Every structure is written in C-alpha cells, then in structure tokens.
Amino acid sequence: MAFALGQRWISDTESDLGLGTVVALDARTVTLMFAASEENRVYASNDAPVTRVVFNVGDVVECQEGWSLKVEQVVEENGLYTYLGMREDTEETGVALREIFLSNQIRFNKPQDKMYAGQIDRMDNFVLRYRALKNQYEQHRSPMRGLCGMRAGLIPHQLYIAHEVGRRHAPRVLLADEVGLGKTIEAGMIIHQQVLLGRAERILIVVPETLQHQWLVEMMRRFNLHFSIFDEERCIEAFAESDNPFDTQQYVLCSLDFLRKSRKRFEQALEADWDLLVVDEAHHLEWSQDKPSRGYQVVEGLAERTPGVLLLTATPEQLGRESHFARLRLLDSDRFYDYAAFVEEEAQYAPVADAITALFSGVKLADEAKNQITELLSEQDVEPLFRIIESNADEESKAIARQELIDNLMDRHGTGRVLFRNTRAAIKGFPVRNVHLLPMPIPTQYTTSMRVSGMIGGKLAPEARAMKNLYPEEIFQEFEGEESSWWQFDCRVNWLLEKLKAQRSEKVLVIASRASTALQLEQALREREGIRATVFHEGMSILERDKAAAYFAQEEGGAQVLICSEIGSEGRNFQFANQLVMFDLPFNPDLLEQRIGRLDRIGQKRDIDIHVPYLQGTAQEVLARWFNEGLNAFAETCPTGRTVYDQVSDQLIEMLASGSNEALNDVIAESAKLNQALKADLEQGRDRLLEMHSNGGEKAQQIVAEIAAKDGDTNLVSFALSLFDTIGLNQDDKGENAIVVTPSEHMMVPSYPGLPYEGATITFDRDTALSREDMHFISWEHPMIQGGIDLLMSEGVGTCAVSLLKNKALPVGTLLLELIYAVDAQAPKRSGIGRFLPRTPIRLMMDARGNDLSAQVEFESFNRQLSPVNRHLASKLVSSVQNDIHRLIEAGDQLVVENVEAIRQQAQQEMQQSLNSELERLQALKAVNPNIRDEEIEAIDAQIKELNGYIAKAQFQLDSLRLIVVSHN
C-alpha cells in the first residue's frame, strides 16, 4: 500500500467511522483521522485494514461545504486525486474538487453490488444481521442501558443511585453508604454507564494499596472493565511508549500512596486528561482549614482538573461534620467554601425533612404542614396537588401528587444532588447474626511455649507482644519448627472437625489472620478427616483465587469449607454460605466488620451463624469478650468501634500483652458506655431526608422490576448462540445453566472480542453468575455480544441473501425484495446521540410493482415460511432479475425518505422534550439550590444545540437486502 498525506481511505473493520484522511506517516505506521466521528487510528502501514477511496466518472460526490459534484474526469497527481465535473447546485461546469475536501460522511460497501457479484450470503446470516440491528437499536434506546449487564444482584438502592448519577454530565458525587451496602458496586455501575454512553473514555481510580486487586477484580468480573494497575515499575516500562506513562492506558488504577510519595508521578497524573476520577476510602484524607494532608492535596489537585468525580467514603456521622465538609469541598470548592456557612445551612433543612416525613406517612396533611410546604415551594402553585391529595381521587393519583411534592422538596435539599448515603437501618433485608462464643481449654503445649516465649522475648513493644499472644500456634512453631503439627492437639481444630462432620451439607467459611494458619488448617482437615476444603490467601494469583472461590461455590462436588487469610478475603463475598468460623480474631474492629461482611451483605438470604472458638485465659479471651460485651460487634455492625478502640487501646494492649485480665470487666463497662453514647449521637445526627432521597423509594423498585423483566430474555439466548455459530465458536453445554465457548480453527476472525484464548464458561442466568465467579454473565451489554454484533456489521455478514417462498396461492416466479435500511447520524459517542437516534433499522418489503408490504408481512412469521437456496442457484436467480432488483431498490430509496424524515422528527422531538425539561428543571432549581453547577446547565444547553445539528444531518443507507422468489415445489 502506498500512502500519501491527504489521501482518503475507509476502514474495513470500522466503516461507521466515515471517511478517513492520512495525517501522519513514518517508516512503519500510518495515522488516519476520521473527522466525522472525531477519532484517530494508527495502523501498521504494511498491513492496514483500510481501502483506498476512488470515485469514477458518473459518480456524485459531496464536498465538506455541502455541495455535490457529478464526476466527469478523474486526475491523479503525486498519489492524490482531483475530481473535475459539474456542481449540482449551481450547474457550474469544470469545477475541481480535491479529494482532501471530500465530505467526511461518505458511505460505501453497497449490499446490491455484492449481490450482483454473486457474493450471496446464507439466509440465516441475513436474519441474524436484521435481529442484531433491531436488538442494538432497542438496547441503545433503553433507559436502563448500562445497568442490566453487570454481574450483581438487583438491589434497589444501588440501582437507584447508579441510575440517578450515571446519566449526568460529568457527575461529581459523594457515595457514603454504610459498610456492606455495596459502594464499590454503585461506583462500578456509574462508571459502566458513563463508558457505554461515551461520556467517560479515560478513567482514574485511586484506592488504598490493599484494595487495588479487589477493585481490579470487581471492575473486571462485574462490569467487564479492564483496568491496569500502575506502580513505579509499570511507569518505567510505559516510558518507552510515551513521555507520560498515564497516557498509555485509558483505564488506570493506582494507590494513593504511589501518587503521594512521588511528586513526578503525581504531576504526570495531573497532566493526563481524565474524564472521571474515582477515590475509594476518601474518609482517610485528613483535612483542616489551615493544614490539609498531602493525600488530601493530591486528590484535590486531581479533582480540580477532572470533570467527573466519585468519592467513596464512610458515613458523614462517622467522619464528623468538619471532615464531611472537606469531602464536599473536593467536589465543588465554589459551593462549599466556608465551614461555618455550611453548618448554618444544614440546620435549615429540618423543616424540609418534617414536610417530607408528613407526605411519606400518607396521613391527612395538617394545616401547619401545608403552610410549610407552600412556603418551601414558594415559586410554584402547589394548591392543585393538595386538592388531589385531599379529594376522593383513586390512590394512584394521590400517590403521584404526593410523589411530585416530595420530588420538588428533595430538589431543594442542599446536598441531595451531591451526596448519597444509605444505612442498614433504612434498608430492609439484612440477616440476623447469631453469635456463638466457644471458650476452650488451652493445651499444655501452648502454655509451656508461651511461658518460655515471655521469658526470652522481654524486649518486644507492648503492641507487638499483644499481637503475638493472639496466635499461640505461631509461638509453638517458633520452638518446635514450622513443620510441627500443632493442629493435632489444638482443641479449636478438634471442634471444627466435629462441626464440619455434623453439618456436611452446609458451606462453611473459616477466616484466620495468617496465610500460614489457613494452609495448615486445610492440611489438618484433609489429613485427619478427608474433608474437602480449599484455601484463599494473598500469596495466590487472582486466577487461583477465582478457581478456589468457584470450587467452594459449586453445589455438587464442591468444597465444603473455604479457609481464608485476612488479606486474601478482602473484597470477596460469599453470600451463598451462612456459617462463619473465626479461627482467631483480628486486632481491629474494622477488620472484624470486614470479616463478617463477607457473608452479611445485602443479598444474603439466610440468618448468619458466627462461631468464635477461643482459648480460655489467653489474649484471645480478652479480645473476644471485649468485642462481644464492650462493642456488641459480633451481633451488630459497629460504626463506632474504631473510635471506642482509640479511647481504650492502651489498657486493652496492656491486657493482651501481659495475659492478665483483671481490668477486663472495667474496660468492657467503660467501652459499652462509650459505645452507647456514640451510637446515640449517630442516631441523633441521622439525616432522615438524605436517607429518603438515597434509597429511591418507589422509583428504585420500578428500576428493579424493569431490569428483572429483561433478565429472562430467551431472545438473547437464541441470538447469542446463533451469533457464536455464525462466527465459528465451539459451544459445549455443561448443565447448571452453563455453556463452555471456545475459539475454533474455522473462525471468521483470528480472535473473538471479549473471549479469552482458552475460551470461557458463560451463563445467561444472573443467580448462577453471582454464585460462580469463574463464569461470564452474558447480557446484551457484554463485550462478547457487543463485539460480536460489531463484527457482523463490519465484516458485512448477511448483507444479501436469496430465499424461496413455497406458496401455491401466488404464481411461480413472483418476486419480492426485502430491503433493510439503516438510519444513523455520524456523531461522537459522548454527544448522547445513541439515546435519541441510535442506528435505526427500517424494513421495506417490495412487491414487483414497487408497493411496500412490510406492514402486512411481519418479519419473524414470514421468515419461518422461507427456505434457503444454494449459492449457485441464488446467483443464477439474481442474474435473471437484476434489472427488477435495480428498479425496486430505486423505488425503495424513494419510499424510505418519508420514513427517515419521520424518524428524524421523532428523534428531535424526544431529544427536545427530554433535555429541555431537564434544563428547565435545573434552571428553576438553580434559583433555590446552589448545588446545581453552572457546568451542568451549560453542558445540557450545548448538547441540545449539538444534537440538533447531528439529527438534521442523519443519513440512510441500504444495509442489507433479500430476494424472495415464489416456487411451488
């Protein structure tokens, strides 16, 4: 291929990009700019999947300025073409049009040309292509786009938050749900929607170091988003590709420490243009008005440069008011500029909360409540709504009127748009925790080794000594060697074996602090009783952990027990089990909550049994009793645990280090009293209004119902299997709702999008996917389906076919021509065009006289009456009626113009209606709620103008056609 600057080429694999221009060349690569879709592509020049665009005499070509030229002569000079001919608008002759000025929106690859050339496709491929077009159109139009395909349970408050935030332009919000309510999933859903809608192409996630892998796995497993972890080593590697390593990947995940410690890397991260910044554990960012921490400054710098920001943090009550204000300041420093003003404003929300509570309760509104609501909504006339609520209207009308008042009041609520927070108290459906504390006698082997260790290890700091005393099996191994079988005499192991034998049908999760303990416990279960167990620790790769988790999840033939180390279990959830054994205890109340959170999460169907075997007279007993009696941390979530621990830690560490528990009862009493007081403060500070707003109420239930209705879509299953067949993938039914899909030697393309080289196990069932992490959950949004549809379209699969209709009511040889047109507007994805005018199929069924019968002849039922024709016969049939086909296509082109105009008008109308009502709502709110950002209003205004232009320029093209001939035998 000989390239030259300014030449026009079209992509073979991405024809929707429009016409490309060669803008850069070097020894090995060529860069094409596709101005219509605002995309650039770099190809290897010796093997670029592009085709040179050359027009011939008689063709009509369009200039970028909008006028057309009928080509009369083609001149080539230095590899560039100039077209000479007549301008169709002014009829001026001898006009020259250089190829660089050709319109960027020219289309090619006509299906009729393929048909005339005898490149006729199989009938079932034509059918698959039409279904792909229809399904893709429906998916793009769906208001639930981006929410159906994630591997997560349908939990109302999560879906509500994601739906509310995910559609905004550059959302800047604080997600502050309590532990176990799924903030990571909410963030993932928002990211997923922003990516699918084209609003976020470059994303940076900043998390504590220990959570990097958890986020990597969650994004990949649940949302099919592949992030790259960046550390110093990765940045040095990436330097070969770019001066700024952060420019080498679109989706980047890194730790806050990494950016905090290296000014150079922080500055590089600042310079990379991100669309969305996500910060987890944002409550650890310390801030005070005069001295913000380095970590806070790092996030502040990134947040100032990035349009969209999601902060995931503890609840505002846990943070304290000032710290909570500091998070809001990161989102909008103009709005949250002064702490004192913020506190004063918060106090003014009490009447709003009272008014909404009155509406929620459904009781008759008192005059005082009505006056309050009228005053709060002073700029609108609320009397008609009051009349409906008090009339004899049906319950539904009353509920709608109530909801409208509630929505309007919510909008006035200061931080309602930037802060979402759900509590366990406000969300139903959590299991009861049954706690079983099991004191056990300490083996003499431990007593001896601990006494000796105490005598010779006197120099240890109290905290280190306390830590050591919690794990007597490790002290024993120090003296007897690592191979010593402590598990032969430890009564906790004996108890565990008996429990597992007694409950063979129950899945049991065992958590120990150390990886070595977990490995030795597995050995004990295997060697002593042949119990099927699997281990999970930080030394394993993500893939190995997945396999272990899948083995544990398997109902038949799976492991009965999963033994996890502390770090290994981070971020993994096993809701299908309800038996938790804590083989030892963590030092920290937050870690204890994390352990229980592996099972006690939203979505757990059964009550949980928590078993805590501990050795009497040891540090384990001190800690078990303090957690249980001082904090009640086993039976309930304990948001106050850390604060209480900080107050009594000195006395606690002293007891754990010395082994004496004389002061234990006093410390427990003091802790319990402190805990009660802190919890009462939290309850007092609960923001009822925020809770009502965050869980979404009735609206959240509707979203769940809508997605659940799509979940059992048999249409998807049959489409996916046909798609895999057509592209050439092997399929093997594995039972348990699972199919194994592997690449074959006869595939249409060397590698299939979204499918690993070794293949994948897939399921169409959400529940199966939730319990089996090794399976891909296939939905319309999954890359294997989206990529497959893109492949069909770009490879031109099914663009022309010939079928026979055996129908004795019609004369033999009767012709029908099925024409499928596609209407679309070439526009950048981020413009939001997909919501109003995605690629829209129009089907015409032309008879020999040029009448359209598509309204009378439905596609699927008609298709069942047709039979395929072999390629040789099909080619002969086409040759014999080529003139008729040509004539009917021309008639179809005339007819479709009206349909296209109607589609344009409908898209304009829907876009104006939807965006203008949102714009008006935000403008009205801006007057009463300073939380509405100017950028949001400006973005919608610009979007309306932009979309008007794109929709007006929407074009149609013939996507595919099928010739149907009537026969009687």
From Swiss-Prot:
A GO BP entry: regulation of DNA-templated transcription
Superkingdom in the source lineage: Bacteria
Alphabetized CDD domains for the sequence: DEXDc_RapA, SF2_C_SNF
InterPro entries assigned: Helicase_ATP-bd, Helicase_C-like, Helicase_RapA, P-loop_NTPase, RapA_C, SNF2-like_sf, SNF2/RAD54-like_C, SNF2_N
UniProt-listed Enzyme Commission number(s): 3.6.4.-
PROSITE patterns (UniProt xref): HELICASE_ATP_BIND_1 (PS51192), HELICASE_CTER (PS51194)
Transmembrane segments: none
Domain Helicase C-terminal: 492-668
Gene Ontology terms for molecular function: ATP binding; DNA binding; helicase activity; hydrolase activity, acting on acid anhydrides
Motif range (DEAH box): 280-283
Alphabetical list of Pfam families matching this protein: Helicase_C (PF00271), RapA_C (PF12137), SNF2-rel_dom (PF00176), Tudor_1_RapA (PF18339), Tudor_RapA (PF18337)
Keywords for this protein: Activator, ATP-binding, DNA-binding, Helicase, Hydrolase, Nucleotide-binding, Transcription, Transcription regulation
Residues given in the record as ATP binding sites: D177, E178, V179, G180, L181, G182, K183, T184
SUPFAM superfamilies reported for this sequence: P-loop containing nucleoside triphosphate hydrolases
Domain (Helicase ATP-binding) ranges: 164-334
Family recorded in the similarity comment: Belongs to the SNF2/RAD54 helicase family. RapA subfamily.
Function: Transcription regulator that activates transcription by stimulating RNA polymerase (RNAP) recycling in case of stress conditions such as supercoiled DNA or high salt concentrations. Probably acts by releasing the RNAP, when it is trapped or immobilized on tightly supercoiled DNA. Does not activate transcription on linear DNA. Probably not involved in DNA repair.
Assembly information from the UniProt record: Interacts with the RNAP. Has a higher affinity for the core RNAP than for the holoenzyme. Its ATPase activity is stimulated by binding to RNAP.
Name of the protein described by the UniProt record: RNA polymerase-associated protein RapA
Organism: Vibrio vulnificus (strain YJ016)
Species lineage: Bacteria, Pseudomonadati, Pseudomonadota, Gammaproteobacteria, Vibrionales
